[in-house]
């Protein structure tokens, strides 16, 4: 769904109307507007290709958990605090950059291998389509994890915190075109 399409105009009017309608509804600290915006953002992202929703969910879950585990290491303190935080930062970086690198560069490396060694590795070509916005949300989720690792912020907690973090990652107006937000904007 392109921003200048009729489909987006209809989508935007519906989302704006629902956002306004849910303005006053709040329960247990959960804002209905945030839930609606998250659902709309996932719909928007899934509209391109529903299979890519799993990628954004994986990035969101990995970084949410990594942030919580790093905070546990920070709160435990001690001289080995950094040693206990580092595996969670590495897990976040490997997962996020691994997904980004796979989708962005896999076919390039297969083609380079074919050209360099004169072999036919056509069976390895996956004809992958680059998921829309993967660079933006990858670096955005990583900024969250890095800020927690550097102790510049504390992670969000609980399921309401998770929903807020998921919305921070997937918010549809900035998901496919940026800008990449700092985690402190959460």
Please provide the spans of the model-predicted regions.
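Membrane-embedded transmembrane alpha-helical bundles that form the catalytic cores
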Residues: 1-186
């Amino acid at each position: 769904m392109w921003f200048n399409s009729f489909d987006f105009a209809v989508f935007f009017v519906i989302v704006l109307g629902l956002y306004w309608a849910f303005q006053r509804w709040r329960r247990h600290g959960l804002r209905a507007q945030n839930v609606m915006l998250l659902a709309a953002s996932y719909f928007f992202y899934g509209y391109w290709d529903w299979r890519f929703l799993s990628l954004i969910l994986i990035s969101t879950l990995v970084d949410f958990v990594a942030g919580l585990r790093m905070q546990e290491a920070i709160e435990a303190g001690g001289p080995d605090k950094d040693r206990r935080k580092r595996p969670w930062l590495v897990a976040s970086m490997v997962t996020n950059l691994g997904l980004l690198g796979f989708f962005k560069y896999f076919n390039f490396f297969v083609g380079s291998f074919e050209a360099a060694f004169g072999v036919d590795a056509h069976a390895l070509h996956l004809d992958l389509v680059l998921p829309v916005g993967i660079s933006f949300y990858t670096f955005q989720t990583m900024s969250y994890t890095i800020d927690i690792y550097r102790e510049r912020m504390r992670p969000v907690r609980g399921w309401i915190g998770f929903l807020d973090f998921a919305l921070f990652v997937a918010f549809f107006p900035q998901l496919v075109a940026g800008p990449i937000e700092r985690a402190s904007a959460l």
